[in-house]
Amino acid sequence: MSKVMTLKDAIAKYVHSGDHIALGGFTTDRKPYAAVFEILRQGITDLTGLGGAAGGDWDMLIGNGRVKAYINCYTANSGVTNVSRRFRKWFEAGKLTMEDYSQDVIYMMWHAAALGLPFLPVTLMQGSGLTDEWGISKEVRKTLDKVPDDKFKYIDNPFKPGEKVVAVPVPQVDVAIIHAQQASPDGTVRIWGGKFQDVDIAEAAKYTIVTCEEIISDEEIRRDPTKNDIPGMCVDAVVLAPYGAHPSQCYGLYDYDNPFLKVYDKVSKTQEDFDAFCKEWVFDLKDHDEYLNKLGATRLINLKVVPGLGYHIDMTKEDK
């Protein structure tokens, strides 16, 4: 059965206000921007997010007031913005409810969710501010239905009496959204390069949406199963979205759009400029096709990477 849908229909069917969502990719690598823009257009809000090594995707959701609670380790457009500006401003202003874990623990939490574990025991974070301080208090947690009542609990190691380990909760993800290079109509997905948390969140979530650069036939994708990363049984919607990770990069196909990210770094310094940017690049555009038309063919083609090198060569002096 074909799972191919339009982006508008996939978001409308599977993503709802109040959901706990997880986004694939890593800072400026294969982030599902096209899907995030559609979430913004559809007015979906009150989201709980487990961000991992997040980027401008989560920064835009936060800056538009769509995030109710945010569990995170790092949010940045690496190499351009070391700490995403709307994320930082909203947190410093007390407008963002956020919890902080170490990056290694967050990625293990995702894997534990994929395995269906009830909780995750770790030896990490002990003796650090991550256990000394809670970003979300117990009192506030009781008001958040998608956030566990405790950040962690100390438990005894049953195999080593007297040793304490940290038990962290396993996320209950409603929707995972991933951008990949290739997918087939039955939902099988191929990810080139780093996989990051993408396989885990696809397996853990109740629903998974995959936007992709290319849809290849079910027959073709089965010819070399060693290249496949996510089985079709884990995917609910497949969406054709060329350059769906822009302005981040998509390994093997196109580089990140450094001038675009620099503009975003500048405009995200103030809420007024950020809002104007979102109006121009998200809300005034009907869909992803209009976004690509606004970027223009020349700009998009110039981002294509040189085969074997992994980056594009049409770089201005400003970019070098």
Curated annotation (Swiss-Prot):
Q: What class of enzyme is it?
A: transferase
| Keyword DNA damage tagged | no
Q: Which terms does the record give in the GO molecular function aspect?
A: glutaconate CoA-transferase activity
Subunit info here reads:
Heterooctamer of four A and four B subunits.
- Write down the InterPro entries for this protein, in alphabetical order: CoA_trans_fam_I (IPR004165), NagB/RpiA_transferase-like (IPR037171)
Tell me which SUPFAM superfamilies the record gives: NagB/RpiA/CoA transferase-like
The answer to whether the entry has keyword Lyase is no
What EC number(s) does its UniProt record assign? Answer: 2.8.3.12
Q: Where in the cell is it found?
A: Cytoplasm
> A single GO CC term, please?
cytoplasm
Q: In which pathway does it act?
A: Amino-acid degradation; L-glutamate degradation via hydroxyglutarate pathway; crotonoyl-CoA from L-glutamate: step 3/5
- State the species of origin: Acidaminococcus fermentans (strain ATCC 25085 / DSM 20731 / CCUG 9996 / CIP 106432 / VR4)
Biological role stated in the UniProt entry: Catalyzes the transfer of the CoA moiety from acetyl-CoA to (R)-2-hydroxyglutarate and related compounds like glutaconate.
Its recorded reaction(s) are: trans-glutaconate + acetyl-CoA = (2E)-glutaconyl-CoA + acetate
Name a single GO biological process: glutamate catabolic process via 2-hydroxyglutarate
In the record, the note on similarity to other proteins reads: Belongs to the 3-oxoacid CoA-transferase subunit A family.
Q: Can you say what this protein is called?
A: Glutaconate CoA-transferase subunit A
Name of the coding gene: gctA
Query: Keywords for this entry?
Result: Cytoplasm, Transferase
